[in-house]
C-alpha cells in the first residue's frame, strides 16, 4: 500500500485482497497490460462482458494481458452473493481463468483505494464516479491508467487498444 506521505504513482503502489482474503501486491503485474473491471453476477451486462472477457483473455494472455475483476454490489444490488459463490459462478459458467478479487466498493467514502486512484487518473467525460457494473480501465505495462471504458463497451471492442499496448499487430 502506498504510504500516507507519498501519492501513488501507478497501480503498482497498491495492495488488494484476493478472493480468499490474502493480500496481493499489484506490482506482481509489472510488464503486463491490464483490464481492471468492476463486475456483477446479476446484471444485464453480465453475460456479454464475461463471455467477451474470457475470449479476449484466452486470445492475449500469452502476450501479456491480464484481467483483474473486482466484484461490486453498489449498482442495483446485482452482486449479492458471497465471494465463493461469485467465483464459482464466474469460473464454472464463464470459464474465467483470470483472477477474481475480493468484493469492493468503487464509489463513496468506502471506495477501495485502487478505485480512487483509477478514477482520479481517468475521470474526465465520465466524472469521478463509476456509473455502473463493468466499467473498465486499461493499464499499460508500466502501471499507468491509459483509458477508461463505459459499461456498455465490450472487451472485444477494446481489442485494438489492447493490441497496441501489447505491441502485437
Curated annotation (Swiss-Prot):
Its main location: cytoplasm. Transmembrane segments: none annotated. GO terms for biological process: response to oxidative stress. Keywords: Cytoplasm, Oxidoreductase, Peroxidase. One of its GO terms (cellular component) is cytosol. Its EC number is 1.11.1.12. It is found in: Cytoplasm. Induction: By fungal elicitor. Pfam families: GSHPx. GO terms for molecular function: peroxidase activity; phospholipid-hydroperoxide glutathione peroxidase activity. Protects cells and enzymes from oxidative damage, by catalyzing the reduction of hydrogen peroxide, lipid peroxides and organic hydroperoxide, by glutathione. This is Probable phospholipid hydroperoxide glutathione peroxidase. It comes from Nicotiana tabacum (Common tobacco).
